[in-house]
Amino acid sequence: MTKYLVVEIQTWDTGAIQTPTNAFDTQASAESKYHDILSKAAVSQLPKHAAVLMTNDGYVMETKCYEHEAAATQS
């Protein structure tokens, strides 16, 4: 049975990286978590904040990364 994984990738200004991962039985539940992470990542204070939605077979369904550091240097 296919499982759906949501990986949050938090890159800190110190260079440290955290990757909290959640597993779900349904695609709908996984997509809900994925979009919840993205809504927080959009306003995050981290230099880079990303999320990946994938299956346990390694198929990547969606991914998005917010790079706040780059946006701040363009101003």
PLM regions and their residue ranges:
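Short, mixed-charge low-complexity intrinsically disordered segments
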Residues: E31, I37-S75
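A short, exposed loop/beta-hairpin motif centered on an aromatic-Gly-Thr core
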Residues: A16-S32
